[in-house]
Amino acid sequence: MIFSDIGLNKNIQKAIKDLGFTEPTPIQQEAIPYLISEEKDLIALAQTGTGKTAAFGLPIIEKIEIDRRLPQTIILCPTRELCLQITKDMDSYAKYTKDLKITAVYGGANIQTQIRALNSGSQIIVGTPGRVIDLIKR
């Protein structure tokens, strides 16, 4: 199986080709088609380094409504480091997806800067639980 077989649009396929991805990993083969075609949750388990971020991130990018400039997905991360890594990966996957805005929100960074970024039309928010809760309360 190759990535073009699992239902991703051409912009995403071009971005993952740039990253050197040729064939989906087992977790990606199972998760991506399911998440693209279903409106249900998925719980999956895989070892470190098996492509879990792409397994959930690529379908998120595929399904985002670009013309809706408001939050559509929140990805919660246990640490600031993982939040930044997932944001970097998502930005790489969305390299050719015009007008998609991904914002990282986490403690230890200026909250006003993060609020401005969110107010500018972020569709995907990647954040730590504490900062996400703080922002919701505001």
Kindly label every feature range from the protein language model:
Residues 1-45:
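Conserved pre-motif I regulatory segment
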Residues 21, 46-49, 62, 90:
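Structured catalytic cores of enzymes that bind and process phosphorylated ligands/cofactors
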Residues 5, 10-18, 68-137:
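Conserved nucleic-acid-binding Ia/Ib motif block in the N-terminal RecA-like helicase ATPase lobe
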Residues 39-60:
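Walker A/P-loop
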Residues 27, 45-50, 74-79:
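Conserved helicase ATPase motor motifs in RecA-like P-loop NTPase domains
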Residues 24-26, 33-34, 59, 78-80, ...:
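Proline-centered helix-kink/hinge sites
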Residues 34-35, 63, 85, 135:
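Residues that scaffold the ATP/ADP-binding catalytic core of kinase and kinase-like folds
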